[in-house]
């Protein structure tokens, strides 16, 4: 039996629209939803959208957000194959030992 690694991930789906002038009237062109990492408010999602290069030329307005949390699972051997090893920060006890 393979060991599995699980992780809950929260993401926000932002619904976007782009405002256009058509025959002297302002209309909203609905764009494809964008997925952002984390549980974001409309204001936070708008800031993230404004940072993206594809919206620099033609800005888009966030008209709604929907947060979701899902549980993801990956075999441990696949995780180890793709993961990057990071050094953990020193604990207070380890720092005290070095200073003593």
Swiss-Prot record:
DNA-binding region: 1-19
Key word Transcription present: yes
Single GO MF descriptor: DNA binding
GO biological-process terms attached to the record: chromosome condensation; DNA replication; viral DNA genome replication
Keyword line: DNA condensation, DNA replication, DNA-binding, Early protein, Repressor, Transcription, Transcription regulation, Viral DNA replication
Superkingdom field: Viruses
Function: Histone-like nucleoprotein that binds to the viral dsDNA and responsible for wrapping and condensing the viral DNA about 4-fold. Forms a nucleoprotein complex in which the DNA adopts a right-handed toroidal conformation winding around a protein core. Binding specificity for the viral genome is based on supercoiling. The formation of the nucleoprotein complex at the genome ends, for which the binding affinity is highest, activates the initiation of viral DNA replication. The binding of p6 would recruit the complex formed by the TP and the DNA polymerase to the origin.
Subunit structure, interactors included: Homodimer. Homomultimer. Binds to double-stranded DNA giving rise to multimeric nucleoprotein complexes.
Protein name: Double-stranded DNA-binding protein
Species: Bacillus phage Nf
